[in-house]
Design a protein with these regions (language model features):
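N-terminal secretory targeting modules
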Residues: 1-66, 71-79, 90, 94-101, ...
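Alpha-helical cap/lid subdomain in secreted, periplasmic
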Residues: 56-59, 82-201
Length: 201
């Protein structure tokens, strides 16, 4: 049995070792600059504005997050309330909600690429007739083994964009150890559809 301590494999891709990082100072100038750089593309904000208007009007709004382990909450303690998805939901609720009218769907499953995301979207997000108003898609790490080289990712994006209630879509490019991701491969999809894109690089 090979020694795999501290390493993960995915379709022949060997992930870099997980290095312990220092705590981030959320009030530092470096952190502020990183956040400023994170918006790769503002895109067409029409659908997002509609979601915000709906929330401010007191109507029920559903935010959905689909992706891999980062969306699931890997590294967050506790996993369900300290993950980026829940933090984004809380911030949206605080800034735009009226009377707890914002709902939350977290469909993150570790190790899954957008190929499975296509199937999981129906099962994990649209279950029981859900109609999310905003969908964040995060597969920038797990799609390394995607033999379609981004076609499944684009198919998932198109699937969400074509839903009859026209949800807003945001593409999130999270990172693995050593600040690695596939945003160079996947960002053309966001540019093609003029979508908001956020990078953690």
């Amino acid at each position: 049995v090979p020694n795999l301590t501290g390493r993960t494999t995915n379709d022949g891709f060997t992930a870099p070792e997980d290095l312990t990082e220092e705590k981030v100072d959320l009030h530092s100038e470096e952190y502020y600059k990183m956040v400023q750089r994170s918006l790769m593309n503002l895109g067409n904000t029409y659908r997002i504005r509609k979601v915000i208007e709906k929330a401010r009007a007191g109507k029920e709004v559903t935010l959905a997050f689909i992706g891999g382990s980062i969306t699931q909450g890997a590294g967050a303690v506790p996993i369900h309330t300290e993950c980026y998805a829940y933090k984004a939901y809380q911030l949206f609720q605080k800034r735009f909600a009226r009377n707890n009218n914002v709902r939350f769907i977290k469909a993150g499953v570790g190790g899954t690429p957008s190929e499975l995301g296509m199937i999981r979207f129906d099962r994990d997000v649209l279950r029981e007739g859900e109609q999310p108003d905003l969908v964040v898609i995060e597969f920038a790490v797990n799609d390394e083994g995607d033999e379609t080289k981004g076609d499944c990712y684009e198919s998932l994006v198109r699937k969400v964009l074509k839903l009859p209630w026209r949800p807003a879509v945001v593409l999130l490019f999270s990172v693995f150890a050593n600040d690695w991701n596939l945003q160079e491969r996947l960002q053309p999809v966001g540019r093609q559809y003029d979508l908001p894109m956020v990078s953690i690089l």
